[in-house]
Amino acid sequence: MPKTTIIRSLLLALLLIAFLFGVGHLFVLRFQTGDIYPPYSSLRSDPLGTRVLYESLESLANITLERNYRFLHSLKPEPGTTFFYLGASADDYHPVPQELIDVCDRLVNSGGRLVVSFLPLNKTRKKGNKVKKEPESQKAENIECLKASQKNTTASIQEHWGVGFEFNQDLPVEDEGHPPLNAVSQRQGLPPIISWHSNLYFDQLDSTWQVLYTSEGYPVMIERSFGKGSLVLSADSFFISNEALRSERQPQLLALLLGRNAKIIVDESHFG
């Protein structure tokens, strides 16, 4: 074999090894920061994750904390549990599988507290039109499993929980979408103003709901009693992100979300 061919082969082998090493190193770095996980995952430590929230809860005395990786239909919550379902897609709630509703009902009827925060949205749609499904849902695998187990039986959030979704169409638009907003609260003990990053809001609220925060006059964080427990819905998740908890931490708001329960579960299963 000519000497030049051997040298070329060695160079190619070295380049391949260097490339594979670089890819492996990049993967390790990404795994360490957690950005291989979806936004608002508690396993993610970059600004878009919620690991700071999880580790803060971990440091609390007399609190039992865990992550849930199982499908929701297998969840059997203990009485007095606060269940965080963070970074949900509002598109998946038009409608939802009946079994998902049943799981939520079991949680709150046992005295639990369900906290659902939705992905920040900057989108538009004609009022009255159904939300268009995203090509890849944050919790598609979980939803499909539940649909199959219930023979595609679905339920309306409006009919069951007394709430609907809408988008504020009257916001100014910048190059990257809508600028950050403020959410304001009149409730004693809560921060009067927090930053807000979504034009999603709740409408068609029945009388059982209490409005915790509004943005541009629209309800964006709401709470209601449900059975023996309670339900909190937030139209944005930014305020519980690592970025927000490092720059504008709101302990009073986090305390309200936790409620008085001693067991806390942070769901990871809906990220797929």
Task: Go through each PLM region and give its residues.
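Aromatic-Pro/Gly-enriched surface loop or interdomain linker
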Residues: 2-75
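Stable alpha-helical elements in mature extracytoplasmic
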Residues: 49, 53, 99-103, 153, ...
